Amino acid sequence: MISEKGLCKVLSAAYKGGGYSVIPVQRRVETVARTWRRNEIILNGATWAVRCLTEDLPKEAAVQIVKDVGYMPMEPVSVQKSQPNQTMLEDVADIRESQLEELRDGSSVMVKIPVIFRDRWQLYQTTTGAVYAFDTELLKLIDFKEVSPECRITPHGNMAMFLWEDEMVFLAPGRFSRENEEKILYIAGMDWENQVEADDPVVNLNLFNADQDEPLLTPEE
């Protein structure tokens, strides 16, 4: 599910910006037949995170990490251009890991609405009608041509999860001014199912005042 090209681009932008963290994880797995440990890795930026088996980390992303950090970390570390590497306290790393583990509890399923507005924000909607927008650059972390991941949003709407087998991508949604909330809901209320079947989805729909939207996320590059 994780796009090699997309992840490398996001890592590069994060490294030049606010930095990112690399958190190796050893998880104990127990079954009736046997018990073993499996190695996972978490990559965590300001508004995104990726989690997968270490062996499934895209090769070029591993190369990018080695280039940025200077080596492949075996312990949690944060890295940023022109700054010394910061070793992460074990307690802090454990908290971040557990927070990601708990996000799925009480989460709701989302479906994509085929609208990209202002050339940047992809809309998703839950079964209860709540609508969220995600930066299309961060969505490039996911190879949607290869898989159709399960999409979920936390109960408070502060983090989305895209899940496929042992791979996970976490994204913070954007936030917009109250004035535009009704317009977002109007877009979501359109009969998208029939429009898609008729091969007539709306793309780059712009009902927003350029001076009024207030994105929560900052550009990664």
Residue ranges and their predicted role:
Residues 7-11, 62, 184:
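Generic structural signal of hydrophobic/aromatic residues within well-ordered alpha-helices
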Residues 54-55, 135:
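Generic structural signal for alpha-helix starts
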Residues 55-57, 62-64:
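Anionic-ligand-binding alpha/beta catalytic cores of soluble enzymes and soluble regulatory domains
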